[in-house]
Structures are given as C-alpha cells and as structure tokens.
C-alpha cells in the first residue's frame, strides 16, 4: 500500500528536486504544497503521513507549520529539508517534533539513510 508523502516548499524547482531524490521503488502517493497552510490542509486530508518540509516559505513558514502540527496533534512524521543550517534552526525544529533536519539539496543517500533510521523505509 502506497505511503502518502507530502513535499512542502514554496519553490517548484525544490519540490521537483526533492521528489527526484526519493528512494527508487519506494511505494508512495506523492502530493505537494507551496506553504504551511496548504501542508496542514493536505495532512488533514490524509496526504501527508510523511512530510518533507522547507523552513522559509510565505503564508506559514516551516516553524509555524511544525507548531501547528503539534498544536492540532496531527498524525505526520516531519523531516525538515532546508538551506537554513543555523544550529538554532536545527534545535528549534527538533524541539517542535521534527524527526530530522536535512540540508538542501537533499541527496538520495541522505534521504534513504534518514528513512531507514526511523523505520520508514
């Protein structure tokens, strides 16, 4: 059965690049969101069991999205994928419940390693 995976990034290029970086043969049903508000709705609609989340976006950024997921106790596993590699950002997203933080651009090997480590793959 396909796993609902959501990629949330305001950049269409980054969304496509992330989709191409997912492991070969991983049975997923892929959805996309351009900002945190869209991501929250997609999760509520059952489209985001796993969420790859950017931090810097308009409308609702990644930090706000994580906070909203926690506040509403939404059922999703969040992996942050961002160019913002400041130690403070890393600590904040982990404190908000993210499984891990991957630096953009995300390599296939790194994504596979994170998914395997958390028993997702």
Named regions from a protein language model:
Residues 57:
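Receiver (REC) domain active-site loop signature in two-component systems and cognate sites
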Residues 12-31:
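Two-component/phosphorelay signaling modules centered on CheY-like receiver
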Residues 35-38, 61-64:
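Acidic catalytic/metal-coordinating carboxylates
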Residues 46-52:
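Active-site beta3 strand of CheY-like receiver
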Residues 106-116:
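C-terminal output helix
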Residues 64, 85-100:
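Alpha4 helix (beta4-alpha4-beta5 surface) of REC/receiver domains from two-component response regulators
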Residues 8-9, 33, 51:
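Conserved sequence signature across two-component system core domains
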């Amino acid at each position: 059965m396909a796993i609902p995976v959501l990629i949330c990034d305001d950049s269409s290029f980054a969304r496509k690049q992330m989709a191409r970086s997912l492991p070969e043969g991983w049975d997923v049903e892929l959805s996309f969101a351009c900002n945190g508000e869209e991501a929250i709705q997609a999760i509520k609609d059952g489209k985001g069991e796993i969420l790859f989340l950017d931090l810097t976006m308009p409308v609702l950024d990644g930090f706000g999205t994580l906070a909203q997921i926690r506040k509403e106790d939404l059922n999703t596993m969040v992996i942050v994928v961002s160019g913002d590699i400041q130690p403070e950002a890393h600590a904040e997203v982990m404190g908000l419940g993210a499984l891990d933080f991957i630096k953009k651009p995300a390599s296939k090997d790194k994504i596979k390693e994170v998914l395997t480590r958390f028993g997702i793959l």
